[in-house]
């Protein structure tokens, strides 16, 4: 019952028909989502729910709300005519996009590669809003200290690009959008593979229909998770 309620809450917002910012990063899933829509999997519900609730609390605190509105978890949906994509930034403050992420990582990032998936999405928002500077907010839920103890930690990172770099991002987005539209029109998904952590029988409901080349048929991507191991106390 709780799982069903959570799924209904996460899916309550109507998704506009078209290409969304998240589709740019995983174009094959965008194709399959368009031709064979699927509800959120149980795993996705469990992953998305805590982050969405925390979004409401953090963004509400930024707006100095006395009572947190759980229905407000981003700035709403926008459309970029230039790029032909829909996008929903978490916050636009003083003209700059601020994107909030929650992370279960035990360690803070050492370099940009440790937060590259977050930065990729933020760059798309920057392209859609035609801005050269933004901020990435990350709420780390379990950062370890020197003694191995864990505690939440909030970090903010400035992200800046040159106009030439922004134009390069825009060109990539436009090319990917055109490819997605063409794939949907023809029914032939001649598209780049999704990111590895979004691919596989355990992670993608379309995996057995998509059969991504180089991945399908391999143990790494084919395997399903086994039953969770439950620690049991010894009998006395």
What are these regions (language model features)?
Residues 56-64, 113-142:
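Metal-dependent nuclease catalytic cores in nucleic-acid-processing enzymes
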Residues 100-103, 159:
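Generic beta-structure capping elements
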Residues 84, 111-118, 159-162, 166-169:
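Short capping loops/turns at secondary-structure boundaries
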Residues 89, 123, 202:
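Residue-level detector of short, conserved catalytic/binding motifs and their immediate flanks
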Residues 130-236:
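Metal-dependent nuclease catalytic regions and adjoining charged, substrate-binding loops involved
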Residues 26, 125, 204:
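A residue-level signal for conserved active-site and pocket-lining positions in enzyme catalytic cores
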Residues 92, 96-100, 133-139:
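A structural signal for short, well-ordered beta-strand segments and their strand-loop junctions
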Residues 1-97, 104-110, 116:
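Metal-dependent nuclease catalytic cores that hydrolyze phosphodiester bonds in DNA/RNA
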């Amino acid at each position: 019952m709780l799982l069903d309620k959570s799924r209904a809450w996460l899916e309550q917002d109507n998704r506009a028909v078209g290409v969304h910012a998240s589709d740019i990063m995983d174009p094959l899933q965008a194709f399959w989502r368009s031709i064979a829509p699927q509800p959120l999997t149980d795993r996705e519900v469990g992953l998305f729910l805590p982050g969405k609730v925390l979004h409401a609390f953090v963004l509400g605190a930024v707006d100095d709300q006395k009572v947190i509105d759980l229905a407000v978890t981003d700035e709403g949906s926008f459309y970029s005519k230039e790029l032909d994509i829909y996008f929903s930034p978490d916050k636009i403050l003083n003209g700059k996009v601020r994107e909030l992420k929650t992370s279960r990582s035990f360690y803070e990032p050492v370099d940009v590669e440790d937060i590259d998936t977050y930065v990729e999405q933020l760059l798309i928002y920057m392209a859609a809003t035609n801005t050269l500077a933004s901020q990435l907010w990350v709420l780390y839920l379990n950062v370890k200290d020197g003694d191995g103890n864990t505690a939440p930690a909030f970090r903010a990172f400035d992200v800046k690009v040159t106009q030439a770099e922004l134009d390069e991002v825009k060109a990539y987005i436009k090319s990917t959008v055109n490819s997605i539209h063409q794939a949907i029109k023809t029914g032939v998904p001649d598209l780049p593979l999704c990111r590895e952590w979004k691919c596989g029988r355990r992670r993608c409901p379309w995996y057995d229909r998509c059969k991504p080349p180089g991945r399908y048929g391999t143990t790494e991507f084919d395997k399903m998770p086994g039953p969770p191991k439950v620690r049991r106390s010894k009998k006395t």
